[in-house]
Structure formats: C-alpha cells, structure tokens
Amino acid sequence: MSYQEKKNIVNIFSAMLITAIYAWIIYQKHLAGTINLREDFTSWGMIFLIFIGVSIVARIVIYIIFHIINAIATRETDTPVEDERDKMVKLMSTRNSYYTFSVCVMSGFVLLAFGMPVYGMFIAFVISGLVSEIVENGSQIYYYRKGL
C-alpha cells in the first residue's frame, strides 16, 4: 500500500473518531442539562469553535504518530515528493468533496423547509463535513488505485 493510501485511510478514521468522540461528549453534556442544544444557538457557536480547535490539535498529534509509525515500519525517513499526478488526484478529490458538501447542506435546507428544527441544521453541517471528508479521502484512494 502506498504512502498516500495509508495517509488517506488514517485521515478517514481520524475524522470519524474525532467527530464521534466530540459528538458523544456534547451529547452527554446535553443529557446532563449542562447545555441546551435545542434552543441556545450561542452554545452551538461555541461548540463549533471548540470542535475546530480540538480537531486541529488532534489531527496534528495523529499525523505525527502516523509519520513516526510509518517511518519505523517502512524504514523511510522522507515523505514522498508530490508530483503532477498527486496534484491532479487531490484536485479531483477536492471537487468530489465540494459537490458532496453542497448536496448535503442543500439537503439540510430542504429538510429545514419541511419542518426540521433549526438545531438539526447544525447537526447537518457536522454530518456534511464528515461525509465530504470521507468522500475526499475515499476518492483519493480510488484515484491512486485506478491510476490517471
């Protein structure tokens, strides 16, 4: 398995893990009555800002651990140089990710128009981001295996 494929698999699992853990913590706080997710939209803003910070720090730690383990396992200290093919794969994967995010967000607006509570839109944003990231990394794996 190539370095790029391993990196994308780590990205997919880290995105799912970070989002699931953070969502579980927030849900437990909601059940305990610490925060009211149904009516307090200020809390949603704080939740998103904290989630972004937590996600960035967790990703940095995960990437460092991944590079250390990969260097030990493959005995390669340098990361592969990004060439034209890598840039094309990233470009096509990013396009797929943007399309997915747009469709998910528009679906959230449609559900909102049909009576979904407003707090559901915040949940739709989180799900849209997670699904689009999975699509982006999955697309990269697909394009690397398929070849361009």
What role is predicted for each listed range?
Residues 60-85:
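Membrane-helix interface/capping segments
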